[in-house]
Amino acid sequence: MNETECEDLIKSVKWTEPANLISLAVLEFINVLVIGGNCLVIAAVFCSNKLRSVTNFFIVNLAVADLLVGLAVLPFSATWEVFKVWIFGDLWCRIWLAVDVWMCTASILNLCAISLDRYVAVTRPVTYPSIMSTKKAKSLIAGIWVLSFFICFPPLVGWKDQKAVIQPTYPKGNHTLYYTTTMSSSEDGQLGLDSIKDQGEASLPPSPPHIGNGNAYNPYDPGFAPIDGSAEIRIAAIDSTSTSTTATTTTTASSSSTTETEMDLDLLNAPPQNRPQTISGSCPWKCELTNDRGYVLYSALGSFYIPMFVMLFFYWRIYRAAVRTTRAINQGFKTTKGSKGIGSRFEEQRLTLRIHRGRGSNQQDSMHSNGSTQSTTTTLGTPSPERLSKYATRRLHHHDKIKISVSYPSSENISELAGHGDVGHERRQSGNALFAVHYNGTNGRESTESQLYRQQQQHGVASSCYLQVGKGLPELARRQSNTSEAGGSGHSRPANKKMGRRNIKAQVKRFRMETKAAKTLAIIVGMFIFCWCPFFTMYIIRPFCQDCVDPLLFSVLFWLGYCNSAVNPMIYALFSKDFRFAFKRIICRCFCSRQSVSLKSSRRGSDMSAIRIRARTPSITPSAAAHSFGDESELHHSEMSNDPR
């Protein structure tokens, strides 16, 4: 593009065309959604203590990256996409392109870090606080920004595409010969001839043959050309009677310095007239993404494809873990309420657990296993080491599955029964069972080979209880016969029952919360792929086949990727109850406070007017009139008392 075409470009812009203004308004509306939504996310986390978690640190970082996209990228991108003219200068063009890649890459890498955080939370819930601590989360966030900067940095130091610059050189009859040269966008005022050697680009030869009118050799002077036997120079011929290019020929130089063309155009004898006095760079009204193939592949892999595959891997593992745990909960954990039978003293509630007995592990090992019980003891609560050592079980060399049913009385009947217990009896306080326990072995027959013990701390407060499966059937049957004899403190037994139920339900509730959070973030990742995958596909195709990508389609897909920055806060509002509540509270603080005050004042005024009208209406009953008169008198008395006179 020559200087004349560049000047005509800025003059041809229709700034006030209705279609352009409507398009600009739509793009700016998207920008407002990006800024407003991500500001809400940041404010919600900082204003709500409930939302201050490690996972939400990554969400805030994601919102910061999206907010910077809305502030530093989208306003300028909207102007460029609508008018196709860059009016902000070449320096800001370079900075804008780098910031665009930086912020978008940081947003994508934040989604990758969130998927890693959810994977650890779902698959390792017990060790999650130590694995993903606040310090480690902050270090990971810092690494995200550094890695994103390394992806956007190369164009700032010269890794850019070669922009074509066309300059006329020679008039020849009805044709004008010119060189199609290239200039690196990192260089100002220097041109390199577009030489093609064999099948790749060749640099200027160190000692090119001299061609021209006797002047000193200058490789950037259009009057000279470094030509050898294997080099080719592309020369275009433009018909002076037409505004379009009529022919493009290839001039091949031999070692005898003779030049022949298909159109018999003698380059050596052409008079060097109308040469441009200055060689200008690229048009300042253009600011586009680079088409350098190497950088396109480098940035596309680092910004999108590698993070996308990492996220898909983590969520596939999360899905598998969620399916396994949900199946275990549905099959091995069930709570039902039974009806009160005739003559029974308990309103039973049945708690069904599923236990796996593994090989070569004792009870102490089971306490350190994460969710996989490798011994014959299932712990409800946190038993003390003394109790664990006292009731430690022997190692087993087989593997079977046991279904255990724990029947415990209601809190009312336990309190009623506790009044008849002997608190001071040490043997009953430490050894008697509180619940009746039965379990089914692998043969399907029900057995009574189990016993539920309870542990009691000082002051009669029970801390935990655990279930032990043993072999002594006669002794166990004898102990179970004493189940109805409840000893100990009346407050410890309901506490034992509630503690065991609370621990199990808390674990299940925590898992379901983690699974729900993972589902919400999976939707975020799905929207991320939907928004960015089409653009990065076209982004890779364009350097290899520029005619294959329609410019309008490329712009639409580019802004579809930008829309991902506006979609994330909407997903939080739709699927997260905590974020939704925080959003409502922030919005009401900003917009509803004045309206509520005016509404209250209007209500007070309407109530007073209604009282006055009711007191003056003659059609009401005498009692109502007396009541209204009393209200009016009280109102008048209150007004008189409030009168400063």
From Swiss-Prot:
Q: Which residues lie on this side of the membrane: Cytoplasmic?
A: 47-56, 116-138, 317-520, 573-645
What tissue specificity does the UniProt entry give?
A: Highly enriched in mushroom body neuropil and in the ellipsoid body (at protein level). Expressed in oviduct epithelium (at protein level). Expressed in the adult and larval brain, thoracic and abdominal ganglia, terminal cells of the larval tracheal system, muscle, mature eggs and reproductive system.
The residue spans the entry assigns to the Extracellular side of the membrane are as follows 1-25, 78-94, 160-295, 542-551
So which residues have sugars stuck on them? 2, 174
Question: Taxonomically, which superkingdom?
Answer: Eukaryota
Describe the inactivation phenotype: Viable with no gross anatomical defects and females display normal courtship and copulation but are impaired in ovulation. Many mature eggs are retained in the ovaries with mutant females laying significantly fewer eggs and taking much longer to ovulate an egg. Increased sleep with longer sleep bouts during the night and a greater number of sleep bouts during the day. Severely impaired learning in appetitive olfactory conditioning which tests the capacity to learn and remember the odor associated with a sugar reward.
Coarse class of the protein's main subcellular location: membrane
The membrane topology noted for this protein in its Swiss-Prot or TrEMBL record is: Multi-pass membrane protein
Composition-biased stretches, type Basic and acidic residues, lie in 629-645
Q: What cystine linkages occur within this chain? A: 93-287
The record's family statement is: Belongs to the G-protein coupled receptor 1 family.
Q: Would you tell me the protein name for this molecule?
A: Octopamine receptor Oamb
